[in-house]
C-alpha cells in the first residue's frame, strides 16, 4: 500500500461522493457499489468473492491485529485512500469499525444464483415478502446463518439489499447466506417446479408450527408485521403455521418469529 496525503476535510469530493453512496439507494444501484465497514464484515466480503473498489482507512484508528493480514494484502489490488479520524467519524455508519470503510462491487441476486443442493439434501429456505425494514432483514439473515439456512429469498422487496443498516444488523450475514431478490410470482413458480413445500406464517386457519413437518424440502414464508402475506402466497401454500400467542398482543417481531420457526426446522432435522 503506497503512502499518500491524508484527507482531512469532509468537503473533499471523494468524501462527498462516499456519503452520497451511503445515503442514496438509487445511486448504489446506478454505480453498482455499496459500503462495508469493519474487519469482520470486510473479511466476510472477501471470503465470498466480492470485489473491493476503494478502501478508506484511518491510520489513527486502524488496529494492528493479526486478523488484518488478509485484508491488508488485498489493499494494493484496489484504490486506497487515507482519512483523518474526524473524517472517518463522518463517513462511518456506526462506531467501533476499526478504521476501515470500503466500497464493494455488487453481485447478481436472481433466482438463477441459488446454489445447487447436494443429492439427498432437503433445502431449507426463508422467504420474506415485501420486507421494508432493513434492520429486520439484517436480523433474519443473522439467524439464517446461525441455523444453516440454504438461502434467504426476498420477494418484492421494499428495502435495498445493500442498505448500510441491513449490513450492520446482519453482522455480515448478507455475505455468508445466499440472498435472492425476485418477485413473489417467480418464487412461487420456482418452488412448485422444484417440489419445495411452502409453509406460510399466519394466525388464521393455521396449525401450530411444531406440529408441522419441516424435514422435507421447505420454504418458510413470512410477510410484514403490518399486513402479513398477500393472497398469492396464502393460496400457494401447502400448509399455514403459527406461533402460539398467549398474551394480549397478537404478533411478534418478524425477525423473532423467523428465528423461532427456523430453529424448529433445525430441531426436527437433527432428531435421532
Model-derived features: where do they sit?
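Active-site/ligand-binding-proximal alpha/beta "capping" segment
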Residues: 200-249, 253
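A glycine-rich helix N-cap at a beta->alpha junction
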Residues: 71-93
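Amphipathic alpha-helical repeat scaffolds
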Residues: 38, 132-139, 253-257
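RNA substrate-binding interface of SAM-dependent RNA methyltransferases
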Residues: 47, 74, 81, 109-205
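Boundary-proximal intrinsically disordered activation/regulatory segments immediately upstream
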Residues: 1-65, 70, 158-159
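Glycine- and other small-residue-rich loops at beta-strand/loop junctions that grip anionic moieties
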Residues: 7, 34, 129-130, 155-156, ...
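Structured adenosyl-cofactor binding patch, chiefly the S-adenosyl-L-methionine
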Residues: 146-147, 161, 166-173, 231-272
Amino acid at each position: 500500500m503506497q503512502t499518500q496525503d491524508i484527507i482531512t476535510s469532509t468537503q473533499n469530493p471523494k468524501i462527498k461522493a462516499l456519503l452520497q453512496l451511503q445515503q442514496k439507494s438509487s445511486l448504489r444501484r446506478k454505480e453498482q457499489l455499496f459500503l462495508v465497514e469493519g474487519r469482520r464484515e470486510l473479511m466476510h466480503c472477501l471470503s465470498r468473492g466480492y470485489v473491493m473498489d476503494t478502501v478508506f482507512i484511518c491510520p489513527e484508528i486502524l488496529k494492528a491485529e493479526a486478523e488484518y493480514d488478509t485484508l491488508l494484502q488485498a489493499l494494493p489490488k484496489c484504490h486506497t485512500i487515507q482519512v483523518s479520524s474526524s473524517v472517518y467519524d463522518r463517513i462511518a455508519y456506526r462506531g467501533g469499525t476499526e478504521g476501515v470503510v470500503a466500497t464493494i462491487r455488487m453481485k447478481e441476486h436472481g433466482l438463477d444464483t441459488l446454489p445447487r443442493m447436494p443429492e439427498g439434501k432437503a433445502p431449507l429456505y426463508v422467504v420474506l415478502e415485501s420486507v421494508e425494514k432493513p434492520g429486520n432483514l439484517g436480523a433474519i439473515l443473522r439467524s439464517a446463518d446461525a441455523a444453516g439456512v440454504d438461502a434467504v429469498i426476498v420477494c418484492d422487496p421494499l428495502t435495498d439489499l445493500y442498505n448500510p443498516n441491513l449490513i450492520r444488523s446482519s453482522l455480515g450475514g448478507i455475505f455468508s447466506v445466499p440472498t435472492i431478490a425476485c418477485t413473489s410470482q417467480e418464487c412461487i413458480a420456482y418452488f412448485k417446479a422444484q417440489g419445495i413445500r411452502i409453509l406460510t406464517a399466519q394466525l388464521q386457519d393455521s396449525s401450530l408450527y411444531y406440529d408441522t413437518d419441516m424435514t422435507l424440502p421447505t420454504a418458510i414464508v413470512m410477510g410484514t408485521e403490518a399486513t402479513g402475506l398477500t393472497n398469492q402466497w396464502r393460496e400457494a401454500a401447502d400448509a399455514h403455521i403459527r406461533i402460539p400467542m398467549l398474551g394480549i398482543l397478537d404478533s411478534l417481531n418478524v425477525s423473532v418469529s423467523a428465528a423461532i420457526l427456523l430453529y424448529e426446522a433445525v430441531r426436527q432435522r437433527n432428531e435421532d
